[in-house]
Amino acid sequence: MLLIIACGNSLRSDDGAGLIFAERLEYACRALDVVVERISVHQLLPELAADIAAEVVQAVVFVDTRLAAPGDLPALQPLSLKAASPSVGHHLTPAVLLLYAQALYHHCPPAWQITIPGVNFDHGESLSETAQNALAHVSVLARQITARLDDPRRNAKEL
């Protein structure tokens, strides 16, 4: 099963683009016969480590929006435990959640991050042209994810 963890706030303009992208990604992956579960949150929480470490999870994709220049495109980036630094603060990164999953539950599936470019994070529910354009790349990234799920050697190298 592919676990998609979407992070964002639909009331902060482009910050909600990650949530929309993740929902569309879920449907695109299902259309490619991938079993998917999607979790949407405002921020990453330590409790998500248990979901990540579940036996049925083959891989995890984190989706979030970041401040970017107009014209930037979303990309699938591998995550590594090597880049994780334990945190006791109020902000967790995807890599730290993977580290928690490994340390607490002894299971850490391959993981990637998709960052959606955004330029407007003011209060509101409309998306900028930059964020809207990013949503058009869902099917391409769904195919990239599916290809990685089908190649366990590639998954092992990324962690």
Give the label of every model feature segment:
Residues 118-120:
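Short, internal active-site loops enriched in acidic
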Residues 1-116, 125-137, 143-152, 156-159:
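N-terminal catalytic or cofactor-binding beta/alpha core of small enzyme domains
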